[in-house]
């Protein structure tokens, strides 16, 4: 998984023992936008649909992950809803389990903050694009009327 590619193998092994297996059926809600995030997810098999009121809908599939920001910034509200687009096998990691392992691997914290920062920047770019498109849409409407 890309999120853990540069991580200490012992750190990854410790986390793997704490992963919880979860199964979702088509159209099951996995994450609700606006709620406080307490865990991240890894897709073992299946496809999920990520829907946000502020960004275009996207799909994630086998090997992808989502919700990682909640491990780094645990009181942040979810910026998107996630639904199963097929029968999904997921593994989840809670913020409590993540932090308990992180206590023994302090150097990993920097790595995860950097990765989370990259994901936040990607989300900001989508939000900016969304607002630019809305602005242009209303300008075109004004010109037509």
Whereabouts are the PLM-identified features?
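Regulatory nucleotide-sensing modules
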Residues: 1-89, 96-100, 144-145
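Compositionally biased, intrinsically disordered low-complexity regions enriched in proline and serine
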Residues: 25, 90-92, 114, 138
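A small-molecule sensor/coupling module
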Residues: 12, 71, 77-80, 95-132, ...
